[in-house]
Amino acid sequence: MLTLDTLNTMLAVSEEGMVEEMILALLASPQLVIFFEKFPRLKNAVTADLPRWREALRSRLKDARVPPELTEEVMCYQQSQLLSTPQFIVQLPQILALLHRLHSPYAAQAKQLTESNSTFTPALHTLFLQRWRLSLVVQATTLNQQLLEEEREQLLSDVQERMTLSGQLEPTLAENDNAAGRLWDMSTGQLKRGDYQLIVKYGEFLAAQPELMQLAEQLGRSREAKSVPKKDAPMETFRTLVREPATVPEQVDGIQQGDDILRLLPPELAALGITELEYEFYRRLVEKQLLTYRLHGEAWREKVTERPVVHQDVDEQPRGPFIVCVDTSGSMGGFNEQCAKAFCLALMRVALADNRRCFIMLFSTDVVRYELSGPEGIEQAIRFLSQRFRGGTDIASCFRAIIERMQGREWFDADAVVISDFIAQRLPDDVVSKVGELQRLHQHRFHAVAMSAHGKPGIMRIFDHIWRFDTGMRSRLLRRWRR
């Protein structure tokens, strides 16, 4: 069967103009205009999606099949082009019958042309074919427009669903244009309103706990940029004036031990006049232990040093992926559970803004994994937020899972974050040793987010940084009072 792409090529019908016209009409639709005004960050993300839309529309037109009736009419037209005028006159009754049987829009006009002219001349033959081709072009264009209109309705429906999802999650997850673009890319999944409302709920909880959001910002961006000299930088001479004691005495500055007879203190001279103390005086003189006045002055001199030239590169500390381990034991239930989930949502926000990965592991008796920054990040986040914290505590398994994950090449600069109340058994020596090796040799950093003031110091000593967010009633009331 004839494809629409082949038909367009045969009749020299250009679909590019129709595709561009449809895209412009879609962007000018009232739904998108209102959406762009409300969420300007997402406008760039939608605009960046236009090449994919164009390619999808071209692919749809290319693969579309032409109806059998139109295919048969086009084949008849092509065969008729090869006939001479006498041959065409012989075939004309069959051609008219075919057009009538196919209910061609050109059938009535073709019949009128033949009946209104008693003699079928070569000029009439050319006119017949030209008008027939024009009718076929109109039919092909109409077919293109029908398919594009169907695609426009489907595309508009999909875009509206994604706009609804992205618009709901934008205040929670989109911090900048980069995050808005990644959020738009993740909105392609089949999600219902009740699903993503869970993210909105925890986003509202996070907004009500600004200290928790601030803590996530500080942890996520705790690696500052630093300046380092360029490699093989030339040396330059650097001169400074330094002040140092001079050899010329100017004033009494204190008392010291020595053998300077001219600066002896009066008590030392008095000892020389006593016979019993005379030998003691000479002993102390030889050993330079006599008390004397200390006299000296000050002088300035030029100190010459060499250092690399001051031109420096700004070497930003690497911001690698997050590997977040969340304690799902029973002691982490209730308000602790809400805070832990909201904190992970805040880290997801930081990861989207900084183009980083965010990998979540839940540990109790088993380890469950979610990646919140992948193409299915929203679905993964919903599954994570739907979990309940009712297990036991096996923090050693958590660390072993982190260590195993960090062996991968794509995780060489990852930061580990452990969220727990740290009321657990001590870590095995092999785990402590391996964590120390990762910190020392590979510069991996381990962060602890302590949800309780009663965490065991022996466990928390292993971390590079400890971020405290006490969820006790007293601390919660104090935070509310300060706000």
From Swiss-Prot:
Query: Where is the protein situated, by its record's location annotation?
Result: Cytoplasm
Organism domain of life? Bacteria
Instruction: Report the principal subcellular site.
Output: cytoplasm
Q: Which positions, given as ranges, span the membrane? A: none
Pfam families registered for this protein in UniProt: VWA_CoxE
Annotated keywords: Chaperone, Cytoplasm
Q: What SUPFAM superfamilies does the entry give?
A: vWA-like
Query: One GO term of the cellular component aspect?
Result: cytosol
Quaternary data: Homodimer. Interacts with RavA.
Q: Which family does it belong to?
A: Belongs to the ViaA family.
The protein's matches in PANTHER family, at most eight in alphabetical order, are given as:
PROTEIN VIAA
Q: What does this protein do?
A: Component of the RavA-ViaA chaperone complex, which may act on the membrane to optimize the function of some of the respiratory chains. ViaA stimulates the ATPase activity of RavA.
Q: What is this protein called?
A: Regulatory protein ViaA
| Gene, per the UniProt record | viaA
